Curated annotation (Swiss-Prot):
PTM sites of type Phenylalanine amide: F65
GO biological process: defense response to bacterium
Residues cleaved off as propeptide: 23-44
Record-linked InterPro entries: Frog_antimicrobial_propeptide, FSAP
Signal peptide segment: 1-22
Organism: Pithecopus hypochondrialis
Function: Has antibacterial activity against the Gram-negative bacteria E.coli and P.aeruginosa, and the Gram-positive bacterium S.aureus. No hemolytic activity.
Name of the protein: Phylloseptin-H5
Region spans: Disordered: 24-44
Length: 66
């Protein structure tokens, strides 16, 4: 009976450790995805802020040659 208790406790302990590791990896993956989304959004904002400058440059060139 004592052997079965020890085996059961060992199985439960190893299961909890495994579950903890999986949850930690999942959390890290979610954090990396969130960081990637934030990076993508900031790149998009930078690109969108350049559009008016590009339009002004094109219109200035057109006025110069036109």
């Amino acid at each position: 009976m004592a052997f079965l208790k020890k085996s059961l406790f060992l199985v439960l302990f190893l299961g909890l450790v495994s579950l903890s590791i999986c949850e930690e990896e999942k959390r890290e993956t979610e954090e990396e995805e969130n960081e990637q989304e934030d990076d993508d959004k900031s790149e998009e904002k930078r690109f969108l802020s350049l559009i008016p400058h590009a339009i002004n440059a094109v219109s200035a060139i057109a006025k110069h040659f036109g």
